[in-house]
Amino acid sequence: TAIITGAGYAKLSNGRCGSIGYGIATAYAKEGANLVITGRNVKKLTDAKEELERLYGVKVVCVQADVNDSADNEAVVNNVVKQAIDTFGRIDVLINNAQASASGVPLADHTTEQFNLALYSGLYATFYYMKACYPYLKETKGAVINFASGAGLFGNYGQCAYAAAKEGIRGLTRVAATEWGKDGINVNVVCPLAWTAKLEQFRDAYPDAFKANVKMPPMGHYGNAETEIGRVCV
């Protein structure tokens, strides 16, 4: 059983899948894994559930979950974990992919609300999910896969809150790897560059920031959410 946050279905302008979370879910579904997927948008979650169950014959539980600065976040996350255990009885993998931000807004113009959006949806969500899943991952000798970003590694323009959240996730991941290794829990971080609906929107809304930040990988193409990002997680 895998819990994948931020796994709603999203389409690119050409109609292809544009969600890293859904790409990861697809890679796991092809291996026959049971899935618990979360997100803020119920329709995107429902669309993902219907597609995954129809195409791959797996069981998918979708749970609306929004970690933010005004919610009882431990209760939000504990509800997701409870539904996973009540339905499947175990958790083998936790994948923290969810992240919202006001990318493109320079640091001097960033508001507290925009900063909190990135920290709560990314860093705090990762923290709460890891804590809630820990006892179950200890039982299964499972794995945690967290998602960070080159935005923090390279100091991307207009991404101060996003970069701060992602660098916090990298630090949190390293500490968990140190502390949880004795429990047989494998903890890793991925910094992907895939062509997604969010990246497409970023390009259209902030063309200057996009040109400054997003460089073509040496392979000559952006990562495929399923075959190149999802397969790494599997």
Task: Give, region by region, the residue ranges found by the protein language model.
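Active-site loop immediately N-terminal to the catalytic Tyr-X3-Lys motif
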Residues: 108, 154-161, 182-183, 220
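C-terminal helical subdomain
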Residues: 182, 189, 208-234
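Residue(s) in the substrate-gating loop at a strand-loop-helix junction
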Residues: 149
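Active-site helix of classical SDR
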Residues: 130, 165, 173
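Substrate-binding pocket helix/loop in short-chain dehydrogenase/reductase
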Residues: 105-107, 111-116, 210-213
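Alpha-helical segment proximal to the catalytic Tyr-Lys
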Residues: 135, 178-182
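Canonical Rossmann dinucleotide-binding motif of NAD(H)/NADP(H)-dependent dehydrogenases/reductases
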Residues: 1-35
